[in-house]
Amino acid sequence: VPVGALVATAAALAIMIALAVVSVRRVCREPVAALLRSVPPRRGSVRLGVLEAMLVAAAAAAFIALVTGSVGGAIGQIAPTLLALAVGVIAARVLSAGLAAAGQRLLLAGRATSGAALLTASRRGTTRWLVPVVTIALCIVVVTADSLAVGARNWSDRAAAEVGAATVLTLDSADLSAVTQAVRSADPTGAHVTPVAILHPTGQDATTTIGVVPASFGRIALWPGIDTASLPWDKLTAPTTPALVVTGSQISYHVVVPAVKVVGPAIRPAPTSLALALRVVRPDGSLESVPLGTIPATGIDADQTVGVSCAEGCRINGIGILAPSGAAAVSGTVTLTQLAMDGRALDLGGAPSWRAPAAVPAGATPSGGAEVTAAFADGSVTLTFDNNGADKAFLAHASVPDVVAAFTTPVSTPSASAATFGGSYVDGSALLLGSVGRVAFVPGGPAAASIVNLDNLLAQGWRGRGSAELAAYLDSADPDVIATVTTALQANGIDVVATRHAAVLATAYGETAAAWSLKLALAVGILAVLVAGVGIVVLASTARRARSRDYAALRLVGQGSRGLALLAQLETAPVVVISALLGAAVGWWAAPSAVSMMPLFPTPSATFPLDVHPASAAALVAGLGGLLALTLVGVATSHAVARHADLQQLREAG
């Protein structure tokens, strides 16, 4: 063989080997992740396209306008959807880059199937459509579930707040004392029934006084959204001094009175006589001043006997002096000894049994009202008085409330700290109140209401007028329980004129036009899942040919059916799950803004504040249900694509 031929052959062989090396050198230098593709690789950038950026900006601007109140009403309810749209478009870009990075790490770790699946998912165009579809759907599901649960909660809570208890019996009696005794006979421990007095004011801007038994009212009344255990019930006090009750028809005593003094310039005529008097509460609760004898202005030292109408018992409310109307102001002292009722010694008690006038702080100006003080000794009492021109000057018994502690609603709370304000007894007479705590509302009461201890209202004036409403609150709607209580009340001469149930009113609220429009959210949520499911199927069908061809190639190189099915499912399931979780999070965050714009009631409540905080349980269950449903759809469609991947796909492609 000629040497030239050998050289030519060797040269040709070397050139062919060099060409082969050069041709595969670039491919060999590429990472495995870059070779696993059936389409040209996309850039790993998360930058948005022009149309995507415009869409995100418009959706974000609309959402901000909605939640800031620039737009409201029915249009405002789409705020979560707009936010989900913006988040979904951005997430589609970010998720593609994230899937690519995760796939590369899995390949480097030797997990070929899962790594290849994530890389393929990051490169498929359908992923960019799948993410916003699922994100919006799950956002709608969570918002609709939350709105339904929040609506149902508010229907129930508003009914509870407006009715006041599970069952409220309105009674035909205006006698609070009789009602209290009848209720206690029906339930001596107050475990299930409690009396309530609702005393509406005569003035439009005044507060409604609501008398309750604190221990049982806090337990039996319905307080949606309020932690009753945190309320300072111990501050709703009533006088602890026992009432001073006398029975008889004649009072006798010895009285010593020096000449009274006219106080200040005598612009008005000086009185020629005064009268010692008792202020008593009659058995019907009415308040009356009973004169006990005349006291000449020049003084007296004598025994006195006077008839009184207390055969059925009188509760002594105060002791003091009566003066003629329009007379000059006078002051003096009255000393009583040998005080007796029908010949029996009458003990007025000591100083602790009577309420001393409020002390005037140093440097402060006296109030200028009538003032009576008392000094007690064995068998005698000395009254020192200055009537300041008033026709009545009494020292009050300690069993009579002074400034009554009250829980007040925001409307009834005075603006000045520690200020007093006017309430009323059952008969409409004035009762001085002071706020010791605030409540958002009073169960069964109006917007301007004050809760007081019922015992204060039983001190006097316990027989009501037309605007006084006496009721019994029950902790049960059981007909047998209601019948038992009604029978016990009737046995005491008290009939039930009306019965209200919180559950019945809640049902009525749930059947209003506003409620039915809200209930349509259930159909919207279901429809959102169906549309998203159809979207997953359509996107899978769009990419089915390319995916089947890829899977057929893998089958050709020895990949088994189970491996192909797993790879196909891993392409779709992570995208669906991540998008669903993202949509649920968006819905959870945006739901309160949307629900606050939804009309839950035909008319707003004057007392109950709406509670739109998210309903955690309902939103979680709905979100998990939507996530499971869409994941199953994605897995099923991917499995179907993998099952149809056979070598025929490669022949068709060739």
Region locations from a protein language model:
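Alpha-helical transmembrane segments, especially those used as permease/efflux helices
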Residues: 1-29, 33, 37-147, 572, ...
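Selective detector of the "anchor" transmembrane alpha-helix that sits immediately C-terminal
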Residues: 10-14, 519-542, 578, 623-631
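Basic-flanked hydrophobic alpha-helices used for secretion and membrane insertion
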Residues: 180, 193, 198-202, 206-500
